[in-house]
């Protein structure tokens, strides 16, 4: 029989509006960043951005039938659930809790990552295991806090946690010198390092302390819309 899913509020809203609203990070080179050039003016570029453009192309045959809304660790799920955005493409980790408790539907993983650490080379360390007593900063809303706690406990390392609220960028707290080491997905560390004024003075340590399957997210229960995003 013909496939005919139930009414999808997001799908119908997108059709009526004529474009897709994508929630993504800002200042994340390689994944999502607004760049100005003489030919196009301001234009969003990056891996997560291209995923959203592909969804727009699947819906309308036009990859530019898209709007981008900047989200942070706190607003990304709120905006998705309340309909401010249609799809979230912002280096978001697929977890059991987010899937079940927050009523979110994760699409196929588009990037397999793992959490790591970045430090200033002046510290003279080559491993996270040498960071006894260090101040370690991480986003208060991500998976980082538990990953770091588990890793440090496993290796008997005492540290000072510095949880950064979503209203402030963790990389800026690190750049200010308010922590000795910064922990997040290694793709994020590499991207953030490139944005520093002095990238050569910072190094990503070799440890990978978690597995982070990243991918786009839609609201749970919107079957027709989730099919569009999943099969794009």
Can you name each region flagged by the protein language model?
Residues 1-5, 11, 49-53, 57-58, ...:
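Extended ligand-binding regions for polar small-molecule ligands
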Residues 3-90:
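Extracytoplasmic small-molecule ligand-binding "clamshell" domains
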Residues 15-16, 56-64, 81-85, 122, ...:
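Sec-exported extracytoplasmic/periplasmic mature domains
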Residues 21-30, 41-59, 93-95, 112-169:
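Bilobed "Venus flytrap"/periplasmic-binding protein-like clamshell domains
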Residues 53, 57, 61-130, 186-210:
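Acidic, polar ligand-binding/catalytic clefts
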